[in-house]
Amino acid sequence: MRILLSNDDGIHAPGIQTLAKALREFADVQVVAPDRNRSGASNSLTLESSLRTFTFDNGDIAVQMGTPTDCVYLGVNALMRPRPDIVVSGINAGPNLGDDVIYSGTVAAAMEGRHLGFPALAVSLNGYQHYDTAAAVTCALLRGLSREPLRTGRILNVNVPDLPLAQIKGIRVTRCGSRHPADKVIPQEDPRGNTLYWIGPPGDKYDAGPDTDFAAVDEGYVSVTPLHVDLTAHSAHDVVSDWLDSVGVGTQW
């Protein structure tokens, strides 16, 4: 199995380093990751400037000022030959649950892999300690995929409780929960009297029902949520069409 491995925490982050070491025990792994933390970069792509890379002695490649999406795009189309069999993103330091997936560079890297036609996995740890647990779960999933490919055309967003492996209760297939909208902005003043702004923490959980990713991780289970790239709200087509007719917009042209 040939794996393109990326993340959004940066190439030196403990999550990606722990996972790369574990994956190399049974797979051919090429790391292509940002040279610094790009958390929250979502699906952003660098278009107004060139991208430089640096290759370490072990073959890992850092993309200078690159986003997670840049890294996967370059990895698939230029840096990994032959091309990968699968794109893996993580292990993220902290969860990507519910609405987090909208902003997550970890999920975005996997989404870019899927957009380019490859199976893709995004892996996050609900904490900052037991990266070895998340690595073991990821390896088990990838070994399963090598035995029997999952033909859903979906991204798997995996969130792992920050627990020793022996304390993991199992795996649940979940849906994304949701949070209350975040609204906290933290102003600060710099030495010259200018106001600086920090974006505050995410909102509290709003929908954390028993079938959500929030509930699974809180209860000690690995959450596996299938995600897809198509953002079309197919069920709303008729509603929107009827609305356009009712307000007279749909008949103007």
UniProtKB/Swiss-Prot annotation:
Q: Where can this protein be found?
A: Cytoplasm
**So what does this thing catalyse?**
a ribonucleoside 5'-phosphate + H2O = a ribonucleoside + phosphate; a ribonucleoside 3'-phosphate + H2O = a ribonucleoside + phosphate; [phosphate](n) + H2O = [phosphate](n-1) + phosphate + H(+)
InterPro entries on file = SurE, SurE-like_Pase/nucleotidase, SurE-like_sf
How the cofactor is bound: the record states: Binds 1 divalent metal cation per subunit.
For the ligand (a divalent metal cation), the binding residues are D8, D9, S39, N92
| Principal location class | cytoplasm
Instruction: Spell out the molecular function terms from Gene Ontology.
Output: 3'-nucleotidase activity; 5'-nucleotidase activity; exopolyphosphatase activity; metal ion binding; nucleotide binding
Top-level taxon of origin: Bacteria
Needed co-factor(s): a divalent metal cation
Q: What does this protein do?
A: Nucleotidase with a broad substrate specificity as it can dephosphorylate various ribo- and deoxyribonucleoside 5'-monophosphates and ribonucleoside 3'-monophosphates with highest affinity to 3'-AMP. Also hydrolyzes polyphosphate (exopolyphosphatase activity) with the preference for short-chain-length substrates (P20-25). Might be involved in the regulation of dNTP and NTP pools, and in the turnover of 3'-mononucleotides produced by numerous intracellular RNases (T1, T2, and F) during the degradation of various RNAs.
Protein family membership: Belongs to the SurE nucleotidase family.
Protein name from the UniProt record:
5'/3'-nucleotidase SurE
